[in-house]
A protein has these predicted regions:
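Secondary-structure boundary elements
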Residues: 58-123
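Helix-start (N-cap) detector for alpha-helical repeat units in TPR-like alpha-solenoids
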Residues: 209, 250-251, 284-285, 318-319, ...
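Structural marker of alpha-solenoid helical repeat scaffolds
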Residues: 245, 279, 313, 347, ...
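Canonical positions in the second alpha-helix
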Residues: 241-242, 275-276, 309-310, 343-344, ...
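Long, contiguous interaction/recruitment modules in multidomain scaffold/adaptor proteins
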Residues: 111-253
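Position-specific recognition of the canonical hydrophobic site in helix A of tetratricopeptide repeat
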Residues: 220, 227, 261, 292-295, ...
Length: 386
């Protein structure tokens, strides 16, 4: 999940937060939590298309994708692979062999790329894909060879927050699960086995919402990183597709707000962030982005309240501490700003902006020696990046 809207504030830039999902490679047994068994979870490709059209009748035919729609050639290869090993009597053995084959150079030979969402045919053509892409191929093939496989959203357990230039990227995690003799057996292409205690099985249509959300993010992220024109309207369309198929998909509402902000439609942006918060009061990203808008509008009190709410949800976010500190600094509350900047640099030691403002706080308090120590730290960080 991520946000991507640089904003000018007193000569500084506030990054937006955008949300996406990335991947996990191991098989393990784990427990399941939060599954809504009252709804259908898995579909055949044909029934999936029918259900999606019913959910989103306004969707154009060319926009509809079956994320797990493996090609006949891929199915033939998978079946031949398992037939060559007649001793694979158990489902867990078959699942393990299939999972390893996807990344085996002598089999499917796929590699992992964090920013590469694509349907199975394109993933195979490229030879790489992200967590959703690789997991989708596994799930599609597993079902074709008679295994029961589902998507898993493990974002509440596996989550990465990082900064790329002016973008704060908040990445969750999609993986898979197979029903075997040992119960739920987890399929993970990134090695975070120790992180799993419980997980949430999601239905195939929610996986499609993740697919569209990821595509929108990648359009923004790749263009910004390459310093190319950003296809914001295309990204906006993908976030809207995610909401079409799952109206309660909070991440897409948040990211929709990011693009509206970039396009200068701040009212629509604020409405999108508020919708995300109403749907999920624990969505710190939407609080963060809405707070950025409030700061941009000069509503420092409103921004401070929203940053504080976001931190109640997620205390380990250095960018939230920094932005709250920036508001406190502008309000003249130097003591509170000092504490916020200290927390930011404790969480991200190379956070230059937070170090610089901490030094400014010390200077204004007459603590010159401490200010110079912080400035020296900044110089060491910069020297290490040269």
């Amino acid at each position: 999940m991520l946000f991507l809207h640089p904003e000018g504030v007193s000569g500084r830039r506030i990054s937006g937060v955008i949300t996406t999902t990335t991947l996990l490679t191991l098989l393990m047994a784990a427990g399941c939590a939060g599954t809504q068994w009252g709804q259908r979870i898995a579909y055949s490709p044909a029934s999936f298309m029918e259900a999606t059209r019913a959910q989103a009748p306004e969707m154009l035919a060319e926009d509809l994708v079956v994320p797990f729609g493996v090609t006949p050639e891929m199915v033939v290869r998978a079946k031949a692979l398992l037939e060559r090993m007649p001793l694979l009597h158990t489902n867990i053995d078959r699942a393990n062999r299939l999972m390893k084959a996807l990344t085996d150079e002598d089999e499917f030979g796929l590699t992992y790329d964090a920013v590469a969402t694509s349907p199975p045919a394109i993933t195979m053509e490229r030879g790489y894909g992200n967590c959703l892409a690789l997991t989708s191929i596994f799930i599609g093939l597993a079902r074709e060879v008679g295994l029961v496989a589902y998507y898993v959203d493990a974002s509440n357990r596996i989550n990465d927050l990082r900064r790329e230039e002016e973008i704060i990227v908040d990445s969750g995690h999609i993986a898979g699960v197979v029903m075997t003799e040992k119960g739920y057996t987890f399929v993970d292409y990134d090695g975070h086995v120790s992180e799993y205690r419980t997980f949430e099985i999601i239905d195939d249509i929610t996986a499609l919402a993740h697919y569209y959300n990821n595509l929108g993010f990648e359009m923004l992220f790749n263009a910004e990183r390459a310093e190319e024109p950003v296809p914001r309207e295309e990204a906006l369309h993908n976030f809207e597709l995610a909401i079409m198929v799952r109206p309660d998909f909070t991440r897409a509402h948040n990211n929709l707000g990011v693009v509206h902000t970039q396009l200068g439609d701040l009212d629509s942006a604020a409405a999108a962030y508020r919708t995300a918060i109403e749907m999920d009061p624990k969505t710190d990203a939407a609080y963060h982005n809405l707070a950025n808008l409030r700061m941009r509008a000069g509503d420092l009190g409103g921004a401070l309240a929203l940053y504080t709410q976001a931190l109640e949800v997620r205390r380990d976010n250095p960018y939230l501490h920094y932005h709250r500190g920036l508001v406190q600094y502008r309000l003249g509350d130097l003591g509170a700003a000092e504490e916020s900047f200290k927390r930011a640099v404790r969480l991200e030691r190379d956070y230059i902006e937070a170090h610089n403002l901490l030094a400014q706080v010390y200077y204004q308090q007459g603590r010159l020696e401490e200010a110079e120590e912080v400035k020296a730290t900044v110089q060491r960080i910069l020297a290490g990046k040269r």
